[in-house]
C-alpha cells in the first residue's frame, strides 16, 4: 500500500509501518503457548476446541489443514483442537454474514478483503462498528474514531496524519489478535 503517492513511499517502508512488523512475521510458538496457557488459567478452562469454516477449494483447504495439524502441536495436543468444516464459498459467506443475527453461527474463519494500494486507510473499514456487511465481533468506538479521522478528518491531508492513523488502526487489530494477518496478493 502506498502511503505517500507523491514520493512513491509504501506504508511498510516507513518507520510506522515497520513498527507493526514482527520478527519471523510474528511467528513465536513459545509466546503463543505462554499466552494460551495464561488465557486458559484466566478463564478457568483446561481445553479449547474450535471449528474453522473455510472454502472447499483453493488455498484455504491446504492452509486450514496445515493449521489443524500444527496449532495443537504448538498449544498442546491435550489442550487445543481445531475441527474443520469445509463448504462452498457462497455458503460460508452467508454463514459469516449471519453473525449479526446469530453471534454463535461460526467460531473462526478466513476473511478476505481487498483495498486499493493507494488508500491503505480505507482498507480498515471492515472492522468499523458500522460496516454494513460486518461479520465478526470486533466493536470499538476508539477504532471508529481513528478510521473516521483518517478518511474524513479536517487534517487528513496534512503530512504524516494518515500514516500515523494507518499504523494505529493496524496496531489496534494486531495486538489483541482481532485478526491474524495472512496476505495473498493475487493481482501482482
Language model segments and positions:
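Extracytoplasmic/peripheral linker and loop segments enriched in polar/acidic and small residues
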Residues: 1, 16-28, 78-94, 120-188
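Solvent-exposed loop/turn segments at secondary-structure junctions
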Residues: 56-60, 89-90, 113-118, 187-188
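Paired acidic/hydrophobic, glycine-rich loop segments that form the ligand-binding mouth/hinge
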Residues: 103-111, 181
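Append "and occasionally in soluble cytosolic enzymes with long acidic Gly/Pro-rich linkers
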Residues: 1-73, 168
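Short, well-ordered beta-strand segments
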Residues: 51-53, 109, 183
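Short helices/loops that flank or line small-molecule/ion binding pockets
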Residues: 65-76, 90-106
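Extracellular/periplasmic catalytic domains that process cell-envelope and extracellular macromolecules
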Residues: 43-46, 100-104, 141, 173-175
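Short beta-strand/turn micro-motifs at beta-sheet edges
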Residues: 39-42, 109, 135-136
